[in-house]
Amino acid sequence: QDPIYTMVDVACNSDLVLMQKHMPEPLTDYLKRYDDHPQLNSTMATKYPGLLKLDVNHFNKPPRVRVSLMPQKYSNILEPKMQDIASRILDVNRLKKLGWEVHLNYSPLVFYPGWKEEYNDLFSEVNAYAGINKCEVIALTNHRNQMAKASPKAQELMRRSYELKNKSGVMRYPLIHKTR
């Protein structure tokens, strides 16, 4: 949520940072459309912040990038071959220096035995290396198509998280610690 602009997810559930070399136009031109708009601004999520080299300090308003985070051992299962979590955290301050508005995207939040302790460790690591950041937390939702493509370990994690939902679909595990 943004107090001034309507945020448009320009990546449409894909990773534009990863796909930027395949785009028909430079990422700068694509984002500039929203920079010049009086009511809209752009946002996109990535699991590859290390590939984002674009300096946007010359923009009128900073585009938002949401850096996806979760404990590394579950990242290895749920998002194999992605940029490792520690280096994503280290990229946060570099992106800020390039003019990006950085949000941390704790997504998907997966519930498993010991999840609170592991997320507390992750929050401590973020605070130590990336400082204070805005964030969003998105609980894992059950997408049959995604589960069918996932490894057996990932399917088990997703199934366990899905079973913790009540009938309204609301998770009953509030986060006590936040990254400020």
What are these regions (language model features)?
Residues 29-33, 94, 125, 180:
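Amphipathic alpha-helical segments that form well-ordered structural scaffolds
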Residues 60-68, 94-105, 121-128, 155-167:
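A short, terminal or domain-edge coil/loop segment
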Residues 1-91, 101-105, 136-140:
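Core AdoMet radical
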Residues 20-24, 116, 180:
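Generic detection of long, well-ordered alpha-helical segments
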